[in-house]
Amino acid sequence: MRKTVNIVISGAATVLLGLGVLLNAPAAQAGGQAPDAKTCNDKDNPPKDAVTQGGCVVIDRAKGNCMGCHQIPGTTSGDIATKFENMAARWPDKAKLREQIWDASKANPNTVMPPFGRHQILSADEIDKVVEFVLSL
């Protein structure tokens, strides 16, 4: 009986420790999902890689706010536009994806997607980082 209790306690401790590690890891580190706001707003240790920086633009409601329309893993997201999954397979030409983000009305004049580049909502550098993030999904 004592051995069984020790095994159960040991197993529970292992599970809780694992959950603690997972919950404290930055979301972008998990891969395939958006970074969390804590990661994006960390002034002492800001994200350095383009994928995470692009993810931070995507979830920033004052900037990209992509999650307002798109389903993005790791966010509470919209469902009125294309779901962000298998993006590298769906957009094998990085330049075309960049052009879509820059000004989606060139491909579809009736789109509701804002022309992020043409209207200077995002800088060229921010768009490049968003492209890197989107292609990581």
Predicted segments with their positions:
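Axial heme c-ligation environment in periplasmic c-type cytochrome domains
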Residues: 30, 77-87, 102-129
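Protein kinase-like catalytic domain
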Residues: 70, 134-135
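N-terminal export/targeting leaders of redox proteins
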Residues: 1-40
